[in-house]
UniProtKB/Swiss-Prot annotation:
Subcellular location: Cytoplasm
Function: Required for maturation of urease via the functional incorporation of the urease nickel metallocenter.
GO MF annotation: an example: nickel cation binding
Description of how the protein assembles with itself and partners: UreD, UreF and UreG form a complex that acts as a GTP-hydrolysis-dependent molecular chaperone, activating the urease apoprotein by helping to assemble the nickel containing metallocenter of UreC. The UreE protein probably delivers the nickel.
UniProt source species: Paraburkholderia xenovorans (strain LB400)
GO CC, any one term: cytoplasm
Protein name per UniProt: Urease accessory protein UreF
Length: 226
Protein backbone atom coordinates (compact mmCIF):
# COMPACT_ATOMS: atom_id res chain seq x y z
CA UNK A 1 0.00 0.00 0.00
CA UNK A 2 1.27 3.46 -0.90
CA UNK A 3 1.85 5.89 1.96
CA UNK A 4 -0.50 8.43 0.35
CA UNK A 5 -3.28 5.83 0.18
CA UNK A 6 -2.71 4.81 3.80
CA UNK A 7 -2.78 8.36 5.13
CA UNK A 8 -5.91 9.15 3.10
CA UNK A 9 -7.74 6.18 4.61
CA UNK A 10 -6.49 7.04 8.09
CA UNK A 11 -7.91 10.52 7.53
CA UNK A 12 -11.29 9.17 6.38
CA UNK A 13 -11.48 6.71 9.29
CA UNK A 14 -10.37 9.25 11.89
CA UNK A 15 -12.75 10.29 14.70
CA UNK A 16 -11.52 13.81 13.97
CA UNK A 17 -13.21 13.79 10.54
CA UNK A 18 -15.88 16.50 10.96
CA UNK A 19 -18.96 14.51 9.93
CA UNK A 20 -20.55 13.99 13.34
CA UNK A 21 -20.08 10.23 13.75
CA UNK A 22 -19.43 10.66 17.49
CA UNK A 23 -23.03 11.76 18.06
CA UNK A 24 -24.58 8.47 16.90
CA UNK A 25 -24.71 5.03 18.53
CA UNK A 26 -26.73 3.20 15.81
CA UNK A 27 -29.04 1.50 18.27
CA UNK A 28 -26.41 0.65 20.88
CA UNK A 29 -27.82 3.11 23.41
CA UNK A 30 -31.29 1.61 22.98
CA UNK A 31 -29.82 -1.87 23.47
CA UNK A 32 -28.37 -0.66 26.77
CA UNK A 33 -31.77 0.71 27.79
CA UNK A 34 -33.32 -2.69 26.96
CA UNK A 35 -30.59 -4.35 29.08
CA UNK A 36 -29.26 -6.30 26.11
CA UNK A 37 -25.92 -4.66 26.90
CA UNK A 38 -24.90 -4.54 30.56
CA UNK A 39 -21.12 -4.94 30.63
CA UNK A 40 -17.98 -5.19 28.49
CA UNK A 41 -18.68 -8.75 27.33
CA UNK A 42 -22.22 -8.05 26.17
CA UNK A 43 -21.04 -4.81 24.52
CA UNK A 44 -18.38 -6.75 22.60
CA UNK A 45 -20.93 -9.37 21.53
CA UNK A 46 -23.37 -6.69 20.37
CA UNK A 47 -20.76 -4.83 18.34
CA UNK A 48 -19.39 -8.07 16.88
CA UNK A 49 -22.89 -9.07 15.79
CA UNK A 50 -23.41 -5.68 14.18
CA UNK A 51 -20.16 -6.09 12.27
CA UNK A 52 -20.72 -9.63 11.01
CA UNK A 53 -24.52 -9.70 10.63
CA UNK A 54 -25.27 -6.14 9.54
CA UNK A 55 -22.23 -4.32 8.14
CA UNK A 56 -20.69 -7.31 6.36
CA UNK A 57 -23.96 -8.19 4.63
CA UNK A 58 -25.14 -4.69 3.79
CA UNK A 59 -23.13 -1.52 4.22
CA UNK A 60 -19.70 -2.91 3.30
CA UNK A 61 -20.70 -4.58 0.01
CA UNK A 62 -22.75 -1.50 -0.84
CA UNK A 63 -19.66 0.64 -0.28
CA UNK A 64 -17.56 -1.64 -2.49
CA UNK A 65 -20.02 -1.48 -5.38
CA UNK A 66 -20.43 2.29 -5.04
CA UNK A 67 -16.66 2.65 -5.39
CA UNK A 68 -16.82 0.75 -8.67
CA UNK A 69 -19.67 2.97 -9.86
CA UNK A 70 -17.60 6.05 -9.04
CA UNK A 71 -14.70 4.55 -10.97
CA UNK A 72 -16.83 4.13 -14.11
CA UNK A 73 -18.80 7.28 -13.27
CA UNK A 74 -22.12 5.51 -13.79
CA UNK A 75 -24.17 8.40 -12.45
CA UNK A 76 -27.57 6.76 -12.89
CA UNK A 77 -26.53 3.57 -11.10
CA UNK A 78 -24.98 5.66 -8.32
CA UNK A 79 -28.24 7.53 -7.80
CA UNK A 80 -30.40 4.40 -7.89
CA UNK A 81 -28.16 2.53 -5.43
CA UNK A 82 -28.00 5.58 -3.16
CA UNK A 83 -31.80 5.79 -3.10
CA UNK A 84 -32.09 2.07 -2.36
CA UNK A 85 -29.69 2.39 0.55
CA UNK A 86 -31.65 5.30 2.00
CA UNK A 87 -34.87 3.30 1.65
CA UNK A 88 -33.29 0.43 3.59
CA UNK A 89 -32.91 2.54 6.75
CA UNK A 90 -35.54 1.18 9.13
CA UNK A 91 -36.10 4.20 11.35
CA UNK A 92 -36.19 7.97 11.05
CA UNK A 93 -33.06 8.23 13.21
CA UNK A 94 -31.01 5.88 11.04
CA UNK A 95 -32.18 7.71 7.92
CA UNK A 96 -31.27 11.13 9.35
CA UNK A 97 -27.91 9.78 10.51
CA UNK A 98 -26.73 8.62 7.10
CA UNK A 99 -28.12 11.74 5.40
CA UNK A 100 -26.42 14.14 7.86
CA UNK A 101 -23.08 12.33 7.69
CA UNK A 102 -23.33 12.06 3.91
CA UNK A 103 -24.04 15.79 3.63
CA UNK A 104 -21.13 16.67 5.91
CA UNK A 105 -18.69 14.43 4.06
CA UNK A 106 -19.83 15.85 0.73
CA UNK A 107 -19.17 19.38 1.97
CA UNK A 108 -15.66 18.28 2.90
CA UNK A 109 -15.04 16.59 -0.46
CA UNK A 110 -16.25 19.60 -2.42
CA UNK A 111 -14.47 22.18 -0.26
CA UNK A 112 -11.15 20.29 -0.45
CA UNK A 113 -11.68 19.62 -4.18
CA UNK A 114 -11.17 15.88 -3.89
CA UNK A 115 -11.50 13.96 -7.14
CA UNK A 116 -12.22 15.39 -10.58
CA UNK A 117 -14.72 18.15 -11.28
CA UNK A 118 -17.20 15.95 -13.18
CA UNK A 119 -17.53 13.41 -10.39
CA UNK A 120 -17.70 16.16 -7.77
CA UNK A 121 -20.58 17.66 -9.73
CA UNK A 122 -22.37 14.31 -9.64
CA UNK A 123 -21.74 14.06 -5.90
CA UNK A 124 -23.06 17.58 -5.35
CA UNK A 125 -26.24 16.77 -7.29
CA UNK A 126 -27.19 13.76 -5.16
CA UNK A 127 -29.66 14.87 -2.50
CA UNK A 128 -30.18 13.34 -0.04
CA UNK A 129 -26.84 11.56 0.05
CA UNK A 130 -26.10 8.38 2.00
CA UNK A 131 -22.87 8.43 3.97
CA UNK A 132 -21.40 5.27 2.33
CA UNK A 133 -21.91 6.82 -1.11
CA UNK A 134 -19.94 9.88 -0.02
CA UNK A 135 -17.28 7.70 1.64
CA UNK A 136 -16.95 5.67 -1.57
CA UNK A 137 -16.38 8.89 -3.51
CA UNK A 138 -13.73 10.11 -1.08
CA UNK A 139 -11.90 6.78 -1.17
CA UNK A 140 -12.06 6.60 -4.97
CA UNK A 141 -10.82 10.19 -5.21
CA UNK A 142 -7.71 9.15 -3.28
CA UNK A 143 -7.18 6.05 -5.44
CA UNK A 144 -7.64 3.77 -2.43
CA UNK A 145 -7.97 0.02 -2.88
CA UNK A 146 -11.44 -1.36 -2.28
CA UNK A 147 -10.41 -3.91 0.36
CA UNK A 148 -8.42 -1.34 2.32
CA UNK A 149 -11.31 1.12 2.10
CA UNK A 150 -13.74 -1.43 3.49
CA UNK A 151 -11.33 -2.26 6.32
CA UNK A 152 -10.97 1.44 7.18
CA UNK A 153 -14.74 1.95 7.12
CA UNK A 154 -15.35 -1.10 9.31
CA UNK A 155 -12.63 -0.14 11.78
CA UNK A 156 -14.04 3.38 12.06
CA UNK A 157 -17.48 1.89 12.76
CA UNK A 158 -16.12 -0.48 15.43
CA UNK A 159 -14.15 2.33 17.06
CA UNK A 160 -17.21 4.58 17.16
CA UNK A 161 -19.35 1.79 18.64
CA UNK A 162 -16.73 1.12 21.32
CA UNK A 163 -16.59 4.83 22.14
CA UNK A 164 -20.38 4.93 22.46
CA UNK A 165 -20.27 1.92 24.80
CA UNK A 166 -17.66 3.63 26.96
CA UNK A 167 -19.99 6.58 27.49
CA UNK A 168 -23.35 4.84 27.77
CA UNK A 169 -22.78 1.52 29.60
CA UNK A 170 -20.39 2.95 30.95
CA UNK A 171 -17.07 1.13 30.47
CA UNK A 172 -13.46 1.95 31.21
CA UNK A 173 -10.91 2.89 28.56
CA UNK A 174 -9.14 -0.47 28.77
CA UNK A 175 -12.42 -2.32 28.23
CA UNK A 176 -13.00 -0.27 25.10
CA UNK A 177 -9.56 -1.10 23.77
CA UNK A 178 -10.15 -4.80 24.43
CA UNK A 179 -13.30 -4.63 22.31
CA UNK A 180 -11.41 -3.03 19.43
CA UNK A 181 -8.57 -5.56 19.63
CA UNK A 182 -11.03 -8.48 19.75
CA UNK A 183 -12.74 -7.29 16.58
CA UNK A 184 -9.69 -6.76 14.36
CA UNK A 185 -9.80 -10.29 12.96
CA UNK A 186 -13.58 -10.22 12.47
CA UNK A 187 -13.08 -7.04 10.42
CA UNK A 188 -10.86 -9.05 8.07
CA UNK A 189 -13.58 -11.70 7.72
CA UNK A 190 -16.26 -9.05 7.21
CA UNK A 191 -14.30 -7.44 4.39
CA UNK A 192 -13.72 -10.80 2.70
CA UNK A 193 -17.43 -11.58 2.88
CA UNK A 194 -18.40 -8.14 1.58
CA UNK A 195 -16.08 -8.40 -1.41
CA UNK A 196 -17.74 -11.68 -2.39
CA UNK A 197 -21.27 -10.22 -2.19
CA UNK A 198 -22.96 -9.25 -5.45
CA UNK A 199 -25.29 -6.22 -5.61
CA UNK A 200 -28.31 -8.54 -5.78
CA UNK A 201 -27.27 -10.29 -2.56
CA UNK A 202 -26.80 -7.21 -0.38
CA UNK A 203 -28.96 -7.73 2.70
CA UNK A 204 -29.92 -5.08 5.24
CA UNK A 205 -32.45 -7.18 7.18
CA UNK A 206 -31.90 -6.45 10.88
CA UNK A 207 -35.31 -6.32 12.59
CA UNK A 208 -34.04 -6.08 16.17
CA UNK A 209 -31.85 -3.12 15.26
CA UNK A 210 -34.76 -1.43 13.49
CA UNK A 211 -37.08 -1.90 16.47
CA UNK A 212 -34.49 -0.65 18.96
CA UNK A 213 -33.72 2.36 16.79
CA UNK A 214 -37.42 3.24 16.56
CA UNK A 215 -37.74 2.93 20.34
CA UNK A 216 -34.72 5.18 20.81
CA UNK A 217 -36.60 8.01 19.10
CA UNK A 218 -38.84 8.31 22.16
CA UNK A 219 -36.37 7.12 24.80
CA UNK A 220 -36.64 9.37 27.86
CA UNK A 221 -32.94 9.89 28.54
CA UNK A 222 -30.25 9.59 25.89
CA UNK A 223 -26.77 10.79 24.97
CA UNK A 224 -26.82 9.98 21.26
CA UNK A 225 -28.88 10.92 18.22
CA UNK A 226 -29.41 7.29 17.19
Amino acid sequence: MRIAELTALLHLASPALPIGAFSYSQGLEAAIEAQLITDADSAREWIASGLTDVLARGELPFLAHQMERWRTHDAESLRVANSEFLASRESAELRRETEQMGWSLRQLCVSLEWGDADRRATLASMTPLAQPTAFAFAAYAHDAAVDATLAAYAFSWVENQAAAALKAVPLGQLAGQRIIVALREPIDAAVTRALATSPDNINTFAPQLGILSARHESQYSRLFRS
